[in-house]
Amino acid sequence: QYNELLASIANTIQDYRGGSLPQPIPDHVERWVQQFDAAVQLPILQEIDHVLKKIYFSKEDVAKFLRGAMRTQKLTGDRPDKFWRSASFLDIQGGGSSQTDMLALFSEQLEDEHGFGIDDCGQGDEVFIYLDDGIFTGNRVRRDLEGWIGGNAPAQAKVHVICIAEHSGGRYYANTKIQEVIRASGKKIDITWWHAIELEDRKTYSATSDVLRPTAIPNDPAVQAHVAAMRYPPTL
């Protein structure tokens, strides 16, 4: 079963970062899992295999999601070609390259669907698209949009935040902070959030959460030292 799991995980992630993982990938996965004690390696592989099969998005999965968003009438209205022509794509991410990668992939799908890419868009001045792969803590999208709202954003705008995976708590946090900045700016800016999957991580819903939270701090010196050094104590 051990080798089967290595092969299964490798097959799922074979296109990760454009296929840049060291080959053969099963050996790479094995080197990764060997950092853990031998007794827990099999359970870890079982869980990783299970989770990745449910939430790993291959490049084709991402392209399919973007094509779906492109065709969503609730987003575009009756004339999707006109909507996308008028929309402006924000390239304002303060760190990393995920937004640039998503914009390039979206442009490819737009070209296939309507015959033009994002460089031919932006003919209007009211609709703006913020693309990214995921919203986790919400800090990235929050800071990006806060800076834009306080700077280049027009007095009135509609912003669509489109991402693959969205953590409920991260979106709630980001949206709350962004709304504060909008009010302070005096601008009229509406934010709408779109996602392929939503992961529940709000503490209020810990019993049905999609993330695992500790219920107790083990009596282990290394763990206790780590917890003591945390800026905010964990919620148990």
PLM ranges: what are they?
Residues 1-86, 95-99, 146-236:
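PRPP-dependent phosphoribosyltransferase catalytic core
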Residues 102-106, 141-147:
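"Short basic amphipathic alpha-helical interaction patches in structured regions
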Residues 114-125:
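Short acidic low-complexity segments
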Residues 125-126, 156:
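Short, well-ordered alpha-helix to beta-strand connector turns
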Residues 131-140:
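Ser/Thr-glycine-rich phosphate-binding loops at phosphate-binding pockets of nucleotides
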